[in-house]
Amino acid sequence: MNKKSLPLMALRDMVVFPGVIAPIFVGRQKSLQALSHTTVSEEDNSKYILVTLQKKFDQENPSKHELNNTAILAKIIQIVKLPNNTAKILIEAVARVKLSNIKGNDAFEANYEIIPDEEIFDVNNMRSLVDNAVQLFSKYAINDKKVNAEIIETINKEISNSTNFINIINILASHLITSLEAKQHLLEETSPFKRITTVISTLTSNIVNSETEQALQQRVRKQIEKTQRDYYLHEQMKAIQKELDEDKSELADIEKKIKSLKLSKEAKEKAESELKKLRSMNQMSAESGVTRNYLETLLSLPWGKYDNSKIDINQAEKILNRDHFGLEKVKERIIEYLAVLQRSSKIRGPILCLIGPPGVGKTSLVKSIAEGMGRKYTKFALGGVRDEAEIRGHRKTYLGSTPGKILGQLKKVKTSNPVMLLDEIDKMSSDFRGDPASALLEVLDPEQNSHFVDHYLEVEYDLSNVIFIATANSHDLPRALSDRMEKIYISGYVEEEKLQIAKNYLVPKQFKMHKIKKDEITISETAILDLIRYYTKESGVRALEREIGALTRKALKQILADKTVKHIAIDSSNLEEFLEAKKYNFGLAEKEDQIGSTTGLAYTEVGGELLTIEALAFPGKGEIKTTGKLGDVMKESAMAAYSCFRSRATNFGLKYDNYKDFDIHIHVPAGAIPKDGPSAGCALFTTIVSLMTKIPVHRTVAMTGEITLRGNVLPIGGLKEKLLAASRGGIKTVLIPEENVKDLKDIPPNIKESLEIISVSNIDQVLKHALVETPINK
């Protein structure tokens, strides 16, 4: 197309799009000069002018370099002269053009070339996009109420013409609420698809902003109306209260309560000070509500209130034996604790902490202690507590502040000397809000807890009469907290103990819970043993109780569904008719002695477990690889076991060439369960020796113990739990460190009778008992 030349006018507050009719007020001298230089076109007898946005909007006299090159060829429809040498023109944007050779001092003039839009190939897609844009524009116009209804009507007419997509895009673009730079960028874009996409994006943003603004205005309006309404009601209430003199009556009750309670001197002074402050306040103010809540909380605490507990250790022992089977050493220590309390009204000894796997009766023991002492029982669950304000309370300055849970529990039981269970004390954690374990130090320390200060109360409260007893699954407690406690370890139950607990406690409890009559259902000992062996795998009896409950419900359902059934007897022969198939295998996992596979013993938070350790050798560089989600300590045990093996390889009839070209892969199933701890050295060493010498390991032998590089066996913890696991797993022989022999006195006699327990002091003795034949060649 041949280039043409026309006068050029700079705009600083608008961008005009093709097909749009727009008014322009002309006041700058250069713009007036450009307008005066326009001439009538020979083609249609009309005047034309070029208009473009200047780059700097605050520039009064922009140079030619400060003008955008993409402009509009506009047809002048009307010129109206105004006072003060200004004018108003009405233009119709004809086409988008590219400017070149801009010149002129008094007025701009430029050559131009019309810029065509890219051709639309995908008409259906464009129609869909344009429809979407028009719908969004209609929604925006309705919400914003700034767009003339005639504009919407014009667009709706244009949409009916499927070939006029470009005009619709231009009309929509001209009414967008966006920056001038964004509109100029939209004008410069030649792709219709990119332009309509930008229009849709901007309209969506405008709608969101408009809706947000309307919602905010509505919320502010409602808040203002509510505030005015509340003020009116409060003034009315205040007038009524003034007439009835209710305020004086309420404050008089608070004053009477302060005088009647056995408050400490500090607490009484604080209460009187707050009451005095409350009298001088506007009763409808926020501050009076805070002060009133504080006084109510302060006066609701059990100041000087104590249960008349008379400890009788014989009666307490009967209660413990009634509620718990076995646990003789634990009950003996509790009775000793109560004996000291019976003789001394205040105890300065350590806090008891019951540590054991889930379901062994830790919580119920604390309830029995409270009953045996004749005191109320309360529980503070510490599992998942991260905020020290849960212990010490929130300061009054915070909105909705309350005292800590310690004082909250005392307020609940209405006594200052309950038995308080601090449950799951090992499950606390810390974050940016503080360390609750450190906050507990003041609560549990007998030298400090008589002067405990809650952040909310801001006065001392005596906690020295509260009996705190903690429970935990793991002995891994913060050092400072651990030093203030006496740990009592509760091991898991053996099979015989579980049987007795089920017969004497769990079955009657479930029958009572489900309203089972005595002659309706009977559960034999063989059925209970099958439940223990094949449906549960735990140190406690929690899962066993659930299975008995499920068994009871299914039997009850059968009785109620079939009126002819009067009695159901459950034994091992029909157990699976009521429950699902057996969940666990009872006995040995391996049917034959295996090479490179050893049974170890592990101690976890849920009790003892059998730990299978297996290994394979394959060509490599003499390295060792471990898998099974092992911790750092266990990985180091594997390295130590391998080094010990290599140092003794010649004793096993192996030459250096037998293992230097082989890598060993040690795996401990199951791979998803984390494993760590210093007690797997013997099992790791035995696995490696069995693998390299091709001598099987006795499948009936399990072992525990760490080893040194010189082959000495070191002592371990959790012996009782490990032996219980060995007994449950069908193990016949257990190898334990020689230094752990002293711990056998705590093992139940039936466990010691069911297992051959052999003490070992070095790895030669381990191999002698673990392997099918001795590999050592003297």
Curated annotation (Swiss-Prot):
The keyword ATP-binding applies. Residues 592-773 form the Lon proteolytic domain. GO terms for cellular component: cytoplasm. GO terms for molecular function: ATP binding; ATP hydrolysis activity; ATP-dependent peptidase activity; sequence-specific DNA binding; serine-type endopeptidase activity. Induction: By heat shock. ATP binds at G356, P357, P358, G359, V360, G361, K362, T363. Residues 6-207 form the Lon N-terminal domain. Keywords: ATP-binding, Cytoplasm, Hydrolase, Nucleotide-binding, Protease, Serine protease, Stress response. The active site is at S679, K722. It is found in: Cytoplasm. Its main location: cytoplasm. It catalyses: Hydrolysis of proteins in presence of ATP. It comes from the Bacteria. The keyword Hydrolase applies. GO terms for biological process: cellular response to heat; protein quality control for misfolded or incompletely synthesized proteins. InterPro entries: AAA+_ATPase, ATPase_AAA_core, Lon_bac, Lon_bac/euk-typ, Lon_lid, Lon_proteolytic, Lon_Prtase, Lon_prtase_N. It is an enzyme of class 3 (hydrolase). Its EC number is 3.4.21.53. Homohexamer. Organized in a ring with a central cavity. Belongs to the peptidase S16 family. HAMAP family: lon_bact (MF_01973). ATP-dependent serine protease that mediates the selective degradation of mutant and abnormal proteins as well as certain short-lived regulatory proteins. Required for cellular homeostasis and for survival from DNA damage and developmental changes induced by stress. Degrades polypeptides processively to yield small peptide fragments that are 5 to 10 amino acids long. Binds to DNA in a double-stranded, site-specific manner. This is Lon protease. It comes from Rickettsia felis (strain ATCC VR-1525 / URRWXCal2).
